[in-house]
Amino acid sequence: MSAKKVYGFLTQAFIFAVIMLVSNMIAAIVPIPIPASVVGLVLLFLLLCLKVIKLEQVETLGTSLTSLIGFLFVPSGISVMNSLGVMQQYGLQIVLVILLATIILLGATGLFSQLILSLSGKRKTEADMKTKTVQSPQNNNELVHH
C-alpha cells in the first residue's frame, strides 16, 4: 500500500491560482461570454480526468472552499438585495418566465431523450436483424421456398 502524499496549502492554492489565471486568459480570448470561473471549473475537471493533476493535489483546499460556499455566495445575495426595486416591479413576470422556461426546457429534454432512445432502438433492432441474417443463411432459403 502506498500512502497518499499530502500537499500543503500553498501548493494547492498555487494550483488553483494557475488554473484561474489560465481560465481568465481563455475567457478573455474566447469571443463567447463565458465566466472565467466556469472555464476554470471545466479546466480543472479536464486536468483531473486526464490525470495531469492528482485529486490529492487539490482535494484539501477544494473541500475547504466547498464548506465556505454559503459565505462565498453572500455577494450574490447582496446584489439581489440591491436590485430589490426591480424585483418588486417585475417579480411576478420574472417568476413566470423562470417557470415557463423550466417547463419548456424539461419538455424539450424529454422529447429529445425519447428521440435519441427511439433512434438507438431502431439501430439496435436493425443491427440485430443483420446479425441474425448473417448467422443463419439457411433460414433465408426456407423463407424463399415457402
Swiss-Prot record:
Annotated family: Belongs to the CidA/LrgA family. LrgA subfamily.
Keywords carried by this UniProt record: Cell membrane, Cytolysis, Membrane, Transmembrane, Transmembrane helix
Topology term for the membrane: Multi-pass membrane protein
Membrane-crossing residue ranges in chain numbering: 7-29, 34-53, 65-87, 97-119
HAMAP family, per the entry: LrgA
InterPro entries, per database record: Antiholin-like_LrgA, LrgA/CidA
Function: Inhibits the expression or activity of extracellular murein hydrolases by interacting, possibly with LrgB, with the holin-like protein CidA. The LrgAB and CidA proteins may affect the proton motive force of the membrane. May be involved in programmed cell death (PCD), possibly triggering PCD in response to antibiotics and environmental stresses.
Subcellular location: Cell membrane
Keyword Cell membrane appears in the UniProt entry: yes
Name of the protein in its database record: Antiholin-like protein LrgA
Segments forming a coiled coil: none
